[in-house]
Amino acid sequence: MATDKGLEDIPEGQIESNYDETVDSFDEMNLKPELLRGIYAYGFERPSAIQQRAIMPVIKGHDVIAQAQSGTGKTATFSISVLQKIDPSLKACQALILAPTRELAQQIQKVVVAIGDFMNIECHACIGGTSVRDDMKALQDGPQVVVGTPGRVHDMIQRRFLKTDSMKMFVLDEADEMLSRGFTEQIYDIFQLLPQSTQVVLLSATMPQDVLEVTTKFMREPVRILVKKDELTLEGIKQFYIAVEKEEWKLDTLSDLYETVTITQAVIFCNTRRKVDWLTDKLTARDFTVSAMHGDMDQAQRDLIMKEFRSGSSRVLIATDLLARGIDVQQVSLVINYDLPANRENYIHRIGRGGRFGRKGVAINFVTADDVRMMREIEQFYSTQIEEMPMNVADLI
C-alpha cells in the first residue's frame, strides 16, 4: 500500500487501462479445482469482459483498479480472486471486502459463499443494523473472508475482534459511492490498521478526485482496467420518456401506465424516502399491489422485502437509489424513474439492472419541464437516446 504518482495526471471521470491481457475461459486461469467447480455450479459459463481482464492480475498479487458499472460481473471478479488467494486451512481473516450499503455487502457475501461452496471456507457479513455481539462471536471463529460496511468494520477492527494480522487482500467495491457517503475517514483509518503488505483492489463506476486520492495514497503501481461505457449495460434497454406537465400529474400518469402494461416485475425509483412512502400509500389506496424499500427501514424489513421481490411474490418495488447499487434482480423487465436521478451516474445503476448481461429491458422516465436539462445531460453523458414513449409500449415490455 504505497503511492503511485502516475495516477495524478488522469482526467477525472475515467481511468486509462494500462493492462490489456485477457483470459477468455475460467479453465485457463489455473484456479483451484474446488473453486472452478463452484464457479460452474453457480451458473457461470465464460468470464465477462471485466472477469477476463481483472481476475489474473489480482491473483498474481498486483494492486488493481477496475472501473466498471454494476451488471458487468464485477462482484464475481473479486470473489473468485479472493477465493483463489485465501488458505482455507487458516482460520483467520485473510480478505476484507468493503461495500457502501448493507444490501450490497450481503449480496457479495452470498456470492462468495456460493462460489466457494466446495472450499470449506467461512465468509461473514459485518454490517450495521445487526447485533454487535453476534458479530464479535462470528469474528472470533476466524472467518477467512469478511465483507462489510465501513462503520461496523472499522469498529470491529478497533475493538480487536476483527484481527488484521493475517490480512492479504483489501477490496473496496463501489469506492465512489462509499466516499461520497462520507465514509472517507473510516476507510483511511482502516487502511492504516492493515499490514503494510496488504494487496488493494478497488472497484468504482466513476473516478472522481476523492477516489483517485485513495488510489494514489494507498496503492502500489496498480494495474488499471477500464471496462468502457459502451461495454456496459444500457445496450438492449429501450429508454423512453413521458412528458408530464406538473409534478402532481405523475401519479395519474403512473396509474394509466399500470392499466396499459402487463408488468412481470418493475422497480419504480423516487429521489427521497418520503416520496417512496407517499407513492406507496397512494398506489395502495388505488388498489395496486406494491412494496417499498428505503434506508429508514430496519434490516429485517429490508431483507424480507428483497426476498419477496426476488421470489416474485411481490411484483412492483418502489425504492430510493439505495436499491440501485448492485442489487441483482434477474427478472426486472421495467424500470420507471418517477423522479429522474439527482446525479447522472445513478441513471445507469437504476436502469442498467433491467437488461443485465444482455437481457432486454425497458426504462420509462417521467420528465417535467424542470427535468429536461437533466435528461439531456444523461443522454450526452451516456451517448444514448431517450425517446418519447410510443403508444405501443405494451408490446415492448
UniProtKB/Swiss-Prot annotation:
Keywords of the record: ATP-binding, Cytoplasm, Helicase, Hydrolase, Initiation factor, Nucleotide-binding, Protein biosynthesis, RNA-binding
Catalysed reaction equations from the record: ATP + H2O = ADP + phosphate + H(+)
Domain (Helicase C-terminal) ranges: 236-397
Domain Helicase ATP-binding intervals: 55-225
GO biological process: cytoplasmic translational initiation
Residues annotated for ATP binding in this entry: A68, Q69, S70, G71, T72, G73, K74, T75
Span of the annotated motif Q motif: 24-52
Coiled-coil ranges (or none): none
Subcellular location per the Swiss-Prot or TrEMBL entry: Cytoplasm
Domain of life: Eukaryota
Annotated GO CC locations: cytoplasmic stress granule
GO molecular function annotations of the record: ATP binding; ATP hydrolysis activity; RNA binding; RNA helicase activity; translation initiation factor activity
Record family assignment: Belongs to the DEAD box helicase family. eIF4A subfamily.
Domain notes: The Q motif is unique to and characteristic of the DEAD box family of RNA helicases and controls ATP binding and hydrolysis.
Designated name of the protein: ATP-dependent RNA helicase eIF4A
Gene behind the chain: tif-1
